[in-house]
A protein has these predicted regions:
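HotDog/MaoC-like acyl-thioester-processing domains
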Residues: 42-45, 56-112
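Amphipathic, positively biased hydrophobic alpha-helical segments used for protein targeting
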Residues: 13, 17-22, 29, 64, ...
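Hydrophobic beta-strand-centered segment that forms part of the acyl-chain substrate-binding groove
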Residues: 16-50, 55-56
């Protein structure tokens, strides 16, 4: 108990990879491959976890991101390389209901 299931870790990794890729390429796509390496347990009852992602390769329509998930002790617990096939923006808008990159960069309104 209190250990984050590997499938949930993979879901978090896939999600953060998509944000990195979508913001880098300004369009949407779909996951085509994900290679995950589980190195340490991730506890859910002893502190916060965090992830970071970086686009590492762009080869035409295939974009790769490397993702790292850190456990509650700030140790690298899981890492993955995630490959997405991206679509031209017009296709992404039609097939994936892509709202456009601007939807992800709306300025935060100042409090009055």
């Amino acid at each position: 108990f209190h250990v984050l299931h590997g499938g949930i870790q993979a879901t978090l990794i896939d999600e953060i990879a998509s944000w990195a890729i979508f913001s880098h390429e300004k369009t949407a796509g779909v996951t085509t491959e994900m290679q995950v390496k589980y190195r340490r347990p991730v506890r859910t009852d002893q502190g916060e976890i965090w992830l970071r992602a970086k686009v590492t390769e762009v080869a035409r329509r295939l974009v790769t991101a490397h993702v790292e998930l850190f456990n509650e002790k700030n140790e690298l617990a899981t890492e993955a390389d995630v490959v997405y096939m991206i679509y031209p923006e017009e296709v992404a808008r039609k097939k994936l209901d892509w709202p456009g990159a601007e939807a992800f960069y709306k300025p935060v309104e100042e409090e009055e």
